[in-house]
C-alpha cells in the first residue's frame, strides 16, 4: 500500500 511506503520513507507520515 502507498501508506506503508510513505511510512517507510517518512516515519512522520506514519503518525
UniProtKB/Swiss-Prot annotation:
Q: GO terms for molecular function, please?
A: neuropeptide hormone activity
Chief place of localization: secreted
Locations listed in the record:
Secreted
**Cystine crosslinks:** none
State whether keyword Cell inner membrane applies.
Answer: no
Modified residues annotated as Pyrrolidone carboxylic acid in this record: 1
Q: Does the keyword Amino-acid biosynthesis apply?
A: no
Arranged from A to Z, the UniProt key words for this protein are: Neuropeptide, Pyrrolidone carboxylic acid, Secreted
Name the GO cellular-component terms: extracellular region
Record GO biological process: negative regulation of juvenile hormone biosynthetic process; neuropeptide signaling pathway
Described purpose of this protein according to its UniProt entry: Strongly inhibits juvenile hormone biosynthesis in vitro by the corpora allata from fifth-stadium larvae and adult females.
Tell me its family. Belongs to the allatostatin family.
Name of the protein this chain belongs to: Allatostatin
